[in-house]
C-alpha cells in the first residue's frame, strides 16, 4: 500500500534518502500532477494540483535519481 505525503518538504526529504531508487511523474489532463518515489519498503506519493508548483518540484528533485515521466 503506498504512503501519501501531504507536504512538499516531506516528499523532498524522502526523495533524498539513500534507499530512494526512482521517481515517476504522472500528469493528468485536468492539471493534476502525481509524483511517486520508490523507496525500498514503500512507494511514496504526493499530489500537486498547481502546474507551477509541479514544475518547481520537478526541478528540485535530486540529480542522481532516475526520473520517468508518464502521460
Curated annotation (Swiss-Prot):
GO molecular function terms noted in the UniProt entry: structural constituent of ribosome
Keywords: Ribonucleoprotein, Ribosomal protein
A single GO cellular-component term on record: cytosolic large ribosomal subunit
GO annotation terms (biological process): protein-RNA complex assembly; translation
Record InterPro entries: Ribosomal_eL38, Ribosomal_eL38_sf
One Pfam family hit: Ribosomal_L38e
Membrane-spanning ranges: none
Keyword Acetylation on entry: no
Keyword hit for Cytoplasm: no
Record family assignment: Belongs to the eukaryotic ribosomal protein eL38 family.
Stated name of the protein: Large ribosomal subunit protein eL38
Lineage of source species: Eukaryota, Metazoa, Ecdysozoa, Arthropoda, Chelicerata
Amino acid at each position: 500500500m503506498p504512503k501519501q505525503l501531504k507536504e512538499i518538504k516531506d516528499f523532498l526529504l524522502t526523495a533524498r534518502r539513500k534507499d530512494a531508487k526512482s521517481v515517476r511523474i504522472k500528469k493528468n489532463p485536468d492539471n493534476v500532477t502525481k509524483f511517486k518515489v520508490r523507496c525500498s519498503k514503500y512507494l511514496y506519493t504526493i499530489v500537486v494540483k498547481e502546474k507551477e508548483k509541479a514544475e518547481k518540484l520537478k526541478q528540485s528533485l535530486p540529480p542522481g535519481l532516475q526520473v520517468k515521466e508518464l502521460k
